[in-house]
């Protein structure tokens, strides 16, 4: 939700309160709702996940694109988290944005896989494509190209998603009028019934053969988790969440046992399996422990995120977070202390103290301050004294 909004939701776990901008996360299996990020953001009109489960959001009016994890520490009501840094070069900041998607399709060239796409609906009227690469704890980006540009002043690209055949579908709201301030809300020129759908293909490359998802066997679905396309794997996991856990879990165990450990994507395949068990609210703790010690820090960070949300099942959650918060990679450590910020004070503070055994870079310092402030029950503006006491 955007700025100027105030939300209070009664849940089985207590009232969830939010004020001004931010994001909610709902687990339908547990009926669990949380204010996953409370940020100073006018209009959050775009959210996307990369292949490792890291989430990013478009700020719209900013018009920045940011990594969400630094801002997902638990906050005191009315206090915002740290938005962190924009990931778009200044000369390519165009507003307002709407829609965010990562390129993950064999139909598109190999060298653009992992790029992110972001739309603009007024000034630029098109879709920009940016490279995204790791940069220590966080990320950096570089503009690659303007993938779509229109001279039609009514062109309003608002969302996009890769289809099962690897093509890119783009939704054009196509409206003469746009904005809630510039024109009367009941202006007859506002079109509520028409729009356009564009399909973007790469002519020199073949389309992807769509994987069978609906009506597929559990074995077929699990094998689909090896496919390169993120959106296919996303749809497969959604389908598996609708199956009976008693039917899926034994097959997940068997599927993982047959994986080739020498395969380059082995750890990612196991991560997909872990996500399936998490989605069924029956997290496989053997897989979780395995991936917390993975060679790839992307996988370790993803495993810590799973650990964050499964404390109701993983009894040694605090001990595992205490180990992760001293990981050699900053992204894993930050996942761990962000997770700790959601725990009770007596559990959280010892974990946060361990995080000080390692340097806090510019991606980590502000989220760490906020994590300590919340766990200590003090205003973040007064946290400097508390931080000194942890040294």
At which residue positions do the language-model features occur?
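Beta-propeller blade termini and top-face loops
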Residues: 1-207, 211-223, 230, 237, ...
């Amino acid at each position: 939700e955007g700025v100027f909004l105030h939300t209070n939701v009664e849940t089985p776990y207590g009232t969830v309160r939010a004020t001004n901008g931010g994001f909610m996360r709902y687990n339908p299996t547990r009926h669990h709702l949380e204010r996953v990020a409370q940020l100073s953001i006018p209009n959050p009109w775009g959210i996307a996940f990369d292949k490792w489960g890291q989430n990013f959001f478009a700020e719209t009016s900013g018009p920045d694109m940011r990594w969400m994890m630094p801002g997902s520490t638990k906050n005191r009501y009315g206090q915002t988290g740290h938005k962190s840094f924009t990931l778009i070069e200044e000369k390519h900041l165009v507003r307002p944005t709407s829609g965010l998607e990562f390129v993950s399709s064999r139909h598109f060239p190999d060298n653009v896989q992992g790029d992110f796409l972001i739309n603009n609906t007024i000034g630029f009227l098109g879709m920009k494509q940016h490279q995204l690469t790791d940069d220590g704890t966080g990320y950096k980006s570089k503009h690659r190209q303007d993938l779509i540009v229109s001279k039609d002043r009514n062109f309003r690209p608002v969302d996009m998603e890769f289809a099962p055949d690897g093509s890119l579908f783009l939704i054009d709201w196509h409206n003469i009028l746009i904005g809630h301030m510039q024109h009367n809300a009941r202006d007859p020129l506002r079109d509520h019934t028409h729009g356009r759908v564009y399909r973007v293909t790469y002519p020199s490359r073949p389309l992807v053969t769509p994987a069978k998802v609906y009506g597929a066997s559990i074995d077929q679905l699990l094998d689909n988790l090896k496919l390169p396309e993120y959106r296919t794997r996303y749809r497969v996991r959604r389908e598996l969440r609708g199956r009976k856990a008693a039917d899926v879990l034994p097959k997940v165990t068997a599927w993982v046992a047959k994986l080739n450990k020498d395969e380059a994507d082995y750890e990612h395949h196991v991560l997909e399996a872990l996500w399936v068990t998490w989605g069924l609210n029956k997290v496989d703790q053997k897989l979780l422990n395995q991936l917390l010690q993975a060679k790839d820090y992307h996988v370790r960070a993803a495993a810590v995120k799973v650990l964050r949300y499964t404390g109701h099942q993983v009894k040694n959650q605090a001990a595992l977070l205490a180990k992760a918060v001293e990981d050699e990679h900053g992204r894993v450590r930050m996942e761990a202390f962000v997770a700790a910020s959601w725990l009770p004070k007596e559990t959280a503070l010892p974990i946060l103290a361990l995080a000080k055994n390692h340097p806090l870079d510019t991606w980590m310092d502000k989220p760490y301050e906020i994590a300590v402030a919340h766990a200590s029950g003090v205003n973040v503006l007064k946290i400097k004294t508390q931080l000194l006491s942890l040294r």
